[in-house]
Amino acid sequence: MGSLSPSDLSPAQIGEHLRVAGRVAAADGAQCDVVDALGGVRVRLRERTGLSAGDLVVIYGEYTGDDLRDAQVVSRTPCAEPRGDGDFARFAWRGVARNLAARARALAAVRSYFASERFLEVETPLRVPAPGVDLHLDAIPASGDYLITSPELHMKRLLVAGLPRIFQLARASRRDELGVLHEPEFTMLEWYRAFAGLEQVLGDTERLLRSVAESVSGAARLFSPSGQVYALDGPFERITVREAFMKYAGIADAVDLSQSDEARYFEVLVTHVEPGLAREARPIFLWKYPANQAALARLSETDDSVAERFELYVGGVELCNGFDELTCPSEQRARFEQDSARRAAENRPVYPIDERFLAALESGMPRAGGNALGFDRLLMLAIGARELGEVLSFPARER
């Protein structure tokens, strides 16, 4: 006869005699609480047994819906009582295990959504010789290679190879990133639609968020760390970068500012625009970025001073970064070389340009829309967590 965990018990088992295995959380004579990280059950023993908090036990008794009665100890392994700062306390008492259960439901919802859209789940290398040259991301060295900051370049090679719709839940790493919304290692959800553009990916993003939120909380809504509720019904509002800088900072042309004084552009973005977006009681797509702020996106066909790039903000949290993808190999090489030169001028690490990616573009990449979404951030908002570490098994501070 196998054993159940305390969190396995359900009303359907009332009246059955069951074996239940777990850890003793508290003991008082002939009564004790047996728990796992996700739940517990009160046990009423036939006789006093000398059980102590921390013991690992298997108990046999009749389940009443409230407790196990007339119970016997089948086996006992004496163990120390869990410390308040230990792993058991963090997972069982501070709710991290429940967050991991929500994470599992969210992952299933992601895979279900993309299966319904006929996407293929893929895996690409985590350690690469050329991690990209993004001006604002530093890669972590790994035995002569680098850990990926994003799976983007290899996924685009798959588009060139003829895969029409792909997604990946990738482990990504970035150097010197740690805070309420940042971890040096995190899960990136990235997807691409060949022969598609920004509109299709914007639609994916809206539908995916609803699906994940419903899987976690039963409703299409997200929660900021302060408790603000964000309904996900209806099309999300869109505001261009130019409009946002005017609305929240009184700056007439963000594109001109990004070209003439990039440092000031980022200062205004962080101190005025993002806080302004955080005050809005709804999800907002910020799009039409200055061309010099989107090295991997194609330029707008109606205004070549802006690129077809978007980010989604919910409660001031940037959730994703999407593009109508650049497919021109010569333009992509020029942008890579420009960014590499800037990294060198700023005394930042300079990484090799990915020649295999550029060679793939030479073969012909179809027009595509793509998005990179911080899965951990989405889960954080789905459960209303205060920081990213609450939705991870072992954040950097717990490793």
How would you describe each model-predicted region?
Residues 1-399:
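Class II aminoacyl-tRNA synthetase catalytic cores and aaRS-like
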